[in-house]
From Swiss-Prot:
Function: Phosphatidylinositol-4-phosphate-binding protein that links Golgi membranes to the cytoskeleton and may participate in the tensile force required for vesicle budding from the Golgi. Thereby, may play a role in Golgi membrane trafficking and could indirectly give its flattened shape to the Golgi apparatus. May also bind to the coatomer to regulate Golgi membrane trafficking. May play a role in anterograde transport from the Golgi to the plasma membrane and regulate secretion.
Organism: Rattus norvegicus (Rat)
Main localization of the protein described in the UniProt heading: Golgi
Name of the protein: Golgi phosphoprotein 3
Domain of life: Eukaryota
Biased composition (Polar residues): 1-11
Length: 298
């Protein structure tokens, strides 16, 4: 499996008095733990998006962001030579579901199982409103015995020699994600002729959204670099790692000056060199996120 990178961001979090009181009550009750913190973080992230003025129509999933970074603006398709994006998008789905409180890893137990040997468990089967995510969630929920993160990335990509497991493959993922972006007004749909066949393409129609995405990635490793993945927004951290795993992160760095480019790639390397097994033990982490990182960087 290909190597994968980082995701970082210094997202300013605003807490209201009510949310602080709720958090205090949760701690006083002794419940919630890391999972409660993840759900609270997800709610705060959504509030931050609202504060920034992003409408629901332009709020993108991790999969859509990675695909958008990989799409050629005018041509409307990803590079024919990119054989990494398929597995990268499946990793995005697992992290997206985890950040939304749908998936978690089984307990590590007394023997301290590694991230790559721990199984993925369905925490909640509540619909997400995204067809691809719900399809992946259904597979995880109904599969017994459970599978590991690495196995799920392979199964959802169709990379298995077991014919009995081919039904796990999510088909036409890039095309379905592109159609989502068309509905959100980011892309459009065209037909292009390639010698012997016609191909549906999705050229960029709203450059502002893509430029905001590129700027967000650049700032995460330049102006807003915090030198600590646990101080970064989890969603942005995951975006950096999975954009690298999907071989599309370079597209975000292409406009940078040489000095900025060198600094950005150096900081990405710092993230890639982190040990997921160590990072997942720290406070307020998402274990599925680090398990996906481990699967791509092992």
């Amino acid at each position: 499996m290909t190597s994968l990178t980082q995701r970082s961001s210094g997202l300013v979090q605003r807490r209201t008095e009510a949310s602080r009181n709720a958090a205090d009550k949760e701690r006083a009750a002794g419940g919630g733990g890391g999972n409660g913190e993840d759900e609270a973080q997800s709610r705060r992230d959504e509030q931050d998006d609202d504060d920034k003025g992003d409408s629901k129509e332009t709020r993108l999933t991790l999969m859509e962001e990675v695909l958008l970074l990989g799409l050629k603006d005018r041509e409307g398709y990803t590079s024919f030579w990119n054989d990494c994006i398929s597995s990268g998008l499946r990793g995005c789905m697992l992290i997206e579901l985890a950040l939304r409180g749908r998936l978690q890893l089984e307990a590590c137990g007394m023997r301290r199982k590694s991230l790559l040997t721990r199984k993925v468990i369905c925490k909640s089967d509540a619909p997400t409103g995204d067809v691809l995510l719900d399809e992946a969630l259904k597979h995880v929920k109904e599969t017994q015995p459970p599978e590991t993160v690495q196995n799920w990335i392979e199964l959802l990509s169709g990379e298995t020699w077991n014919p009995l497991k081919l039904h796990y493959q999510l088909r036409n993922v890039r095309e379905r994600l592109a159609k989502n972006l068309v509905e959100k007004g980011v892309l459009t749909t065209e037909k292009q002729n390639f010698l012997l066949f016609d191909m549906t393409t999705h050229p960029l129609t709203n450059n502002n959204i893509k430029q905001r995405l590129i700027k967000k990635v650049q700032e995460a490793v330049l102006d807003k670099w915090v030198n600590d993945p646990h101080r970064m927004d989890k969603r942005l951290l995951a975006l950096i790692y999975l954009a690298h795993a999907s071989d599309v992160l370079e597209n975000a760095f292409a406009p940078l000056l040489d000095e900025q480019y060198d600094l950005a790639t150096k900081r990405v390397r710092q993230l890639l060199d982190l040990d997921p097994e160590v990072e997942c033990l720290k406070a307020n982490t998402n274990e599925v996120l680090w398990a996906v990182v481990a699967a791509f960087t092992k």
